[in-house]
Structure formats: C-alpha cells, structure tokens
C-alpha cells in the first residue's frame, strides 16, 4: 500500500454523494494509518512504518458472507452478478428505517428518517403480521400457524411471487455488511488513535454503492472528522506487494512511462495512453 500511496499518481481518492470522486495528491508523511483489507473476511492492519505493522482486528463478515448468503437467498452465481442486482435493488423494501418507526427524523439523537434502523427488519415485521393475522382469523397459536404455513408453502410458492425481490435483498445485504465493516474500522481507528483509514481488497471492486456506504459509515461515526480513502487498484495489493518484495531494479515511477523515459539517443519518450486512467467505478448500467 505504501507504494500505491507514494508512487502512483491518481491512485488514492475519496468519495461522497456530493463530490463523488476526489483524488488525493501523493504525500510522504503517510504513517501511521489503518488498512482495512476486505476479501472473504476482513483484516484491519495498523501500519506504523515501512516495515512496522500489526493486525489489530477484523471480522468474519466480509465478501464471503455476502456471496454465501446471496447464493442461498436469490441463487446468484457470481460476485459481479450480485453487485449488478444490488445496483437495481431498493433496500427500503427490505430494511426497516428510522422513518418506519417514528414517521420522521429522530432529531434528538441525530438520525434521519432514511437511516437504516434494522437490516432485513421488514422481513421480520411481515412475518409477525402474518402470524397475528392467522391467529386472529383462524384461532391458531404460533406453533399451529408455523406448522400450517410450512404445509401450505409449497402451494403458495406456485401461485405467488416472492414477497421480496432478489435485487432488493442483494442491496440490503450489501449495505448491512458494508456498514458493519465501516463501523468496526472506525472503532479500531479510535482505539489506536489513527486518523487515516484506507480500504482495499477485491470485495470493493470499484463498486459505487460499496464505496459510498463505507465512506458514509466513516463520516457518520466520526461526525465528519475522518475520511475513508480508496484505491484504483484495490484488488492488487497482495500481488504488487509480492512483486515489490523481490526488490526489482528501477521500481517506482522512476523511468516510468508516466514521467517519460530517455532512450539511447537521449530523447524523452512519453506515453499518452496514461492520461485517461480513471477508477473503475461501476455505473448505473452495471
């Protein structure tokens, strides 16, 4: 990560709904910082110097959790398919919001009506309402209702569409996992007095909703005092690290195409193909 931060132009950026992408200039005073690497699980690394680091925390709820649960819930087969579904989904049809509970913002504790109060909360609410309706109309207790529900479920599945769309479920679960990671990352940064938080790993994949959720979580829990930083090549930290460990000659931007190289005749050669490199954020059509 040090290499990406200090050597690669237009590599590190912040993200928000108002100022979607803002590139950070490379800097030399990068330590200390927290690296949140999100793959199948999540590891959080405190980096204090070029060769000084320690794993300070993490969580088992990561990309593997999203993939595993969505493959069971909606039959998605690939991670990109799940992200595409999440793009089209509406989590408010699945999640219970503050506005669903109070009817408006809860200003006393600073919660907007659009804040998620309970991930998948409307699923539970619908189940409870169905149970009460069955008890009131058929005189069934909970045990009898559940037994009858399981008996009738096969017939109802034939005649009725699922109450929750696959896209809505995908978006809700993506938000749940991303928000959880963001909150834990903030808590670790507070515990270890770290003001800079970088997010990496193949879970992110340049996905706009994932990046926005992680960024919002850090901003929310820190009351705007901290930012989440992201990388254009977030999925290649391990590969580039293994490459650099071999200490290749002339590594870094020295003699790179980005700065121009000098050929045997002493002429500077520039590579104009590097001009339009942008982060691979998924757009709305993904």
Show the residue positions of the predicted features.
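Intrinsically disordered, low-complexity domain-flanking/linker segments in eukaryotic proteins
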Residues: 10-26, 131-160, 255-282
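Glycine-rich, charge-dense phosphate/pyrophosphate-binding loop(s)
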Residues: 190-200, 210-221, 229
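Glycine-rich phosphate-binding/hydrolytic loop that grips phosphoryl groups
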Residues: 1-7, 66-71, 78, 83, ...
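Glycine-rich phosphate-binding loop plus the immediately following alpha-helix
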Residues: 3-7, 48-106, 121-126
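Conserved phosphate-binding catalytic cores of ATP/NTP-utilizing and phosphoryl-transfer enzymes
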Residues: 1-33, 48, 243
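Short beta-strand segments
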Residues: 33-41, 45, 85-86, 266
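Active-site nucleophile and cofactor-binding loops and adjacent substrate-binding regions
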Residues: 36-38, 56-61, 174, 206, ...
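Adenine-nucleotide phosphate-binding core of ATP-dependent small-molecule kinases
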Residues: 109-196, 203-207
């Amino acid at each position: 990560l040090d290499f990406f931060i200090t050597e690669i132009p237009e590599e590190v950026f912040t993200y928000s709904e108002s100022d979607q992408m803002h590139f950070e200039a490379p800097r030399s005073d990068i330590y200390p910082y927290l690296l949140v690497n999100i793959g199948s699980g999540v590891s959080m690394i405190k980096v204090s110097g070029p060769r000084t680091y320690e794993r300070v925390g993490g969580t088992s709820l990561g990309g593997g959790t999203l993939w595993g649960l969505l493959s069971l819930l909606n039959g998605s087969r690939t991670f990109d398919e799940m992200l595409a579904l999440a793009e089209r989904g509406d989590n408010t049809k699945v999640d219970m919001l503050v506005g669903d509970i109070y009817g408006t913002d809860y200003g006393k504790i600073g919660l907007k009506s659009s804040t998620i109060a309970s991930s998948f909360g409307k699923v539970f609410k619908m189940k409870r309402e169905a149970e009460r309706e069955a008890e009131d109309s058929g005189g069934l207790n909970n045990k009898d209702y559940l037994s009858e529900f399981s008996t009738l479920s096969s017939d109802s599945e034939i005649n009725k569409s699922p109450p929750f769309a696959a896209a809505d479920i995908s978006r809700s679960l993506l938000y749940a996992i991303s928000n959880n990671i963001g909150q834990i990352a903030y808590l670790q940064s507070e515990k270890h007095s770290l003001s800079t938080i970088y997010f990496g790993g193949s879970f992110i994949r340049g996905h706009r909703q994932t990046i926005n959720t992680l960024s919002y979580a850090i901003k929310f829990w820190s009351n705007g005092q901290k930012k989440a930083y992201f990388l254009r090549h977030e999925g290649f930290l391990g590969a580039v690290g293994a490459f650099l460990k071999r200490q290749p000659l002339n590594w870094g931007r020295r003699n790179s195409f980005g700065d121009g190289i000098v050929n045997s005749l002493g002429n500077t050669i520039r590579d104009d193909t590097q001009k339009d490199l942008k982060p691979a954020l998924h757009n709305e059509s993904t």
